[in-house]
């Protein structure tokens, strides 16, 4: 059995976790992921409480800088994200590229997750290492409803990334017509 198959067996339920506490305590796979990260990736919601209770590694990072919350978001595991935030995960944590959970939810088009993260305090003006804000990311990917929500919440419409592009300029470059209409309406108001 490969290492990830082995870890899945060891975290599949509370009994398995209890039997393997010593093994799980310091376990990392070849990508430096903890058992909690693997559970978040695979949607093993029943394992989350027990893993957090025993190991409290909410902010540990893998080789890309992703935390358990970022893995839950990347895999659209809303229930798990909710559980992690209730246990103290940082809604504004960043991976090594500077992307936050909100940025990842926008990139993947997980609107419900994006709204959830915003309701739980995600920073609308945070920046990744390219200088992009969530508004620039949403504009670039054509996420018009999220663009509207970010503007409602006070996202900086004039923010520029490291190349000098604003959210509106990004929308134009990527041909995001719905987003361009939103910025046109904002200018008219």
Swiss-Prot record:
ANK repeats lie at residues 31-60, 64-93, 97-126, 130-159. InterPro entries: Ankyrin_rpt, Ankyrin_rpt-contain_sf. The keyword Repeat applies. Keywords: ANK repeat, Repeat. Coiled coil: none annotated. This is Putative ankyrin repeat protein TV1425. The lineage of its organism: Archaea, Methanobacteriati, Thermoplasmatota, Thermoplasmata, Thermoplasmatales.
């Amino acid at each position: 059995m490969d290492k990830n198959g082995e870890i899945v067996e060891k975290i599949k339920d509370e009994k398995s976790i209890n039997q393997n506490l010593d093994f799980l305590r310091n376990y990392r796979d070849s990508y430096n992921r903890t058992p909690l990260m693997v559970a978040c990736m695979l949607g093993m919601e029943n394992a989350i409480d027990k893993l957090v209770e025993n190991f409290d590694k909410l902010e540990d990072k893998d080789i890309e800088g992703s935390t358990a919350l970022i893995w839950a978001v990347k895999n659209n595991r809303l229930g798990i994200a909710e559980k992690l935030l209730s246990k103290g995960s940082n809604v504004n944590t960043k991976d090594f590229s500077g992307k936050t959970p909100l940025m990842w939810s926008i990139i993947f088009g997980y609107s419900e997750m994006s709204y959830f993260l915003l309701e739980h305090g995600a920073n609308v003006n945070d920046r990744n290492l390219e200088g992009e804000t969530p508004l620039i990311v949403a504009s670039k990917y054509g996420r018009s409803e999220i663009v509207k929500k970010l503007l409602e919440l006070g996202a900086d419409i004039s923010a520029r990334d490291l190349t000098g592009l604003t959210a509106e300029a990004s929308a134009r470059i990527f041909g995001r017509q719905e987003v361009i209409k939103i910025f046109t309406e904002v200018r008219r108001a």
